[in-house]
Each structure stands twice: as C-alpha cells, then as structure tokens.
Amino acid sequence: MLERIKDSFTHSIQTKIDASEALPESIAKAAEMMVHCLLGGNKILACGNGGSAGDAQHFSAELLNRFEVERPPLPAIALTTDTSTITAIANDYSYDEIFSKQILALGQPGDILLAISTSGHSGNVIKAIEAALSRDMTIVALTGKDGGPMAGLLSINDVEIRVPSNSTARIQEVHLLAIHCLCDNIDRTLFPQDEQQ
C-alpha cells in the first residue's frame, strides 16, 4: 500500500514534468485570450462533469473572488451549479443539453467557454462547444488522452490544453495546475501593480 501511494506521487510528478514541456505555450495563449475577453467587457463560461465540474467551479470562484492578489472581481460563470436549471433541461430535453441551452441563453460574441473533459468525449461538453461556436464565442478546452471529439471541433482561433497522459487522475491534477496558471497570468497581466514574488 505504501509503495502504491509513493508511485502515485511519482507518476503525478512525472506527468507534471511532461506537461511542463508540452503545455506552457497553450496555457499562455489561453490566458492571453481570456485577458482580451475580459478587457473587452466579456465573460468566461465554464463547464465539465464530475471532477471537471469541480474544476469549472474552482476556476469561476478564483475569478469572481480572487486568486493570490487583491483585485476587483472578474466575470466568470460555472454552468455546473444551478441544479434546478440542470435537472429541468435534463428531464425535459436530455443530459447532453444541460450546458448548451445555458450557453445559448447567456453566451455572447466575444465570450469564452472553458470546456473541461479528461477524455474529450463528454457529450454535453461537446454540445456546449457547438453552442458556443454558434454564438461566436472562443473555446479554451482542457483535455487529456487523445483529445477526443472535442479536439476536432476546435479551430485556429481556439486553444486546446491537452495533458500528455492517459490516466484520468493525473489529467485532473494537471488540469488544476493549468487553471491556477491561467488565473495567475490573468491577474498579473490585468493588475501588474499587484505583482508579488
């Protein structure tokens, strides 16, 4: 058991090392897009399932409240939190539409969708991307494995941050780090006077 726990740490560290080589450019581009979005008076919508829903809420909370520096709140909405809306859509239409219908109502041209799926195969996240694109939104996709069908929906205007791993747990761990990197870059670009070491 102890060896298995140590292996989990080792595998997590190695995945982060691999990601540190593969992901910085994508994360930097995504952060730049988010800064441009926010400066333009737009907002960021976020969605995912299970642990990825938690990540969507985590990202939204960091923007609405604060990350590591004091600053004004920034507009972000996690589409995973309104149980009345989610269950109404799932019951009346389908689970695949729980995010897309919200995006069609709330999304505006210039907004960004942060779409999170460890596999890239989540049907409702795929529908969310399609809805966002129909609203002239830009996509930042956090994925893993081979990117799945989500990767195929993205254009040169979008960004995929694909974790180089096939382990769902390891992908989720790097997704959280990527989210923290996005928040840090957003804060330090928008509020450089608040920079701390």
Curated annotation (Swiss-Prot):
Biological pathway: Carbohydrate biosynthesis; D-glycero-D-manno-heptose 7-phosphate biosynthesis; D-glycero-alpha-D-manno-heptose 7-phosphate and D-glycero-beta-D-manno-heptose 7-phosphate from sedoheptulose 7-phosphate: step 1/1
Similarity remark: Belongs to the SIS family. GmhA subfamily.
HAMAP family, sorted: GmhA
Name of the featured protein: Phosphoheptose isomerase
Gene transcribed to yield this protein: gmhA
Transmembrane regions listed in the UniProt entry: none
Function: Catalyzes the isomerization of sedoheptulose 7-phosphate in D-glycero-D-manno-heptose 7-phosphate.
Binding site for substrate: 49-51, 62, 91-92, 117-119, 122, 172
Other observations noted: The reaction produces a racemic mixture of D-glycero-alpha-D-manno-heptose 7-phosphate and D-glycero-beta-D-manno-heptose 7-phosphate.
